[in-house]
Amino acid sequence: MKRLFVFAVALAGVSAAFWSGATEPAEADFVFREADYFHRWSQGNQHEFTPEGQEDLEKWTDMITVNAYPHVHDGDSLAAAANAVLENYRSSQAKVLRTDSVPRTSDRPAEHLIAAVFGRPELIEAAFARFQLIDGKGYSFVYSHRIYGKKSGDPMSAWLSANGPEVEKALMEWKFSPDSLP
């Protein structure tokens, strides 16, 4: 009888945890700028990650999007992918703030960076996109920061002044492992 009681109590505890939605905190997929990022969504070769507390993909502040480019295997095709994204940003009326390339060295392929701002009536978004070859495969890592509201231009300018160079540096130094992808 004692065994049955212990089983019933354990089952009740498991059942209560299940129905209340209680779960152990998930382990972060990676860390960027001292913030833990968690996988939120994937489709095809695109994967989106946000910090804890920013699970709502309709209203987030910080996001990292990882794009895999299966057809990109060398420096020329990586540059072509970066240029295609740059043209896409321009055709979307983004204000391109800066582009840069890190030249190839004997032990490291070239990399590319695009920093741009997208304005919409209800928000403004800054995007920093790094294009990199990892183990012979092309990726882009896009850190985006949003500010919501109709008058978000001045706050975004202030945010960019305070954070832009540091975000760019952190993104270009970031050691991402494709093993973090779902």
Where are these regions (language model features)?
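Bacterial N-terminal signal peptides
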Residues: 8-16
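Sec/Tat-exported extracytoplasmic proteins
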Residues: 41, 89-93, 171, 175-178
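Bacterial N-terminal signal peptides that target proteins for export
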Residues: 1-8
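Ser/Thr-rich, low-complexity intrinsically disordered terminal regions
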Residues: 47-51, 107-117
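Secretory pathway targeting signatures of secreted, lumenal, and periplasmic proteins
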Residues: 35-73
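Short N-terminal segments immediately surrounding and downstream of signal-peptide cleavage
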Residues: 23-40
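Short, well-structured beta-strand
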Residues: 111-182
